[in-house]
A protein has these predicted regions:
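N-terminal glycine-rich anion-binding loops that anchor highly charged ligand groups
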Residues: 12-24
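Active-site cores enriched in adjacent His and Asp/Glu residues with nearby glycine-rich loops
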Residues: 21-87, 136-178, 190-194
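Generic structural signal for buried aliphatic residues
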Residues: 91-93, 196-198
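Short, Lys/Arg- and Gly-enriched loop/turn segments at beta-strand edges
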Residues: 99-106, 204
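Short, compositionally biased
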Residues: 104-120
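A conserved acidic, glycine/proline-rich C-terminal tail/linker
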Residues: 182-188, 204
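Single conserved hydrophobic/aromatic residue that forms the stacking wall/gate
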Residues: 197-206
Length: 206
């Protein structure tokens, strides 16, 4: 069932999302050659706790870390460890924080030093596709309108959409309905209403 939040719940979620976004920004600042993914994860863990929140990913379905850090060909759900970042890597960091019983969840991809023009284009197109999708996150539109916009933009720039993973609702649980694919025909799926919280998570491939 799709959960629509009331104003009190939205305020709590805004706080949770601000903490999550700040944790993601911290991770991005640490992406540089010579740093291990475990070091980034530890810093994010400590920051989230310092904000009175808890790392949502840690222990979720047995996941052993506070972040998902995926490098280069790894699409999502990379487990932090002793891998050392090197020049030219592209590094996706996914973070979740729970505060007041509600969850924030966000991700971004960062360049480690100088990267190839193709890798930079991948990052740029993926980020812009997120905003293209958000343009259709409006009351009365259909969920599939978002994915259609994302897919159309990405494919127009020579990339493909990863269909195995989708965005999702978020709230008291990290994964709530509805699913938000990054592809599809417009005009399908549930209609969006005010105070529906969902996460659009564009993932791309060369």
């Amino acid at each position: 069932m799709i959960s629509v939040k009331n104003e009190r719940e939205l305020e709590i979620m805004r706080k949770a999302c601000k903490i999550t976004a700040a944790a993601r920004a911290l991770a991005g600042e640490m992406v540089r050659p010579g740093v291990t993914t475990k070091q980034i994860d530890k810093a994010v863990y400590e920051f989230i706790l310092s904000q009175g929140a808890k790392p949502t990913f840690l222990g979720y379905g047995g996941f052993p870390a506070s972040t998902c850090i995926s490098i280069n060909e790894v699409v999502i759900h990379g487990i932090p460890g002793n891998r050392v970042l090197k020049e030219g890597d592209i590094v996706s960091v996914d973070v979740g924080a729970t505060w007041g019983g509600f969850t924030g969840d966000c991700a971004a991809t960062f360049a480690c030093g100088a990267i190839s023009p193709t890798a930079q284009k991948l990052i740029t197109v993926t980020e812009q596709s997120f905003y293209e999708g958000i343009k259709f996150a409006r009351q009365g539109n259909r969920i599939s309108d978002i994915g259609h916009a994302v897919q159309t933009y990405v494919e127009s720039h020579g990339f493909g959409v990863v269909r195995a993973f989708v965005g999702h609702g978020v709230g008291e649980k990290m994964h709530e309905e509805p699913e938000v694919p990054n592809y599809g025909s417009p005009g399908r799926g549930p209609r969006m209403v005010l105070s529906l919280i969902h996460i659009s998570e564009p993932t791309r491939q060369f």
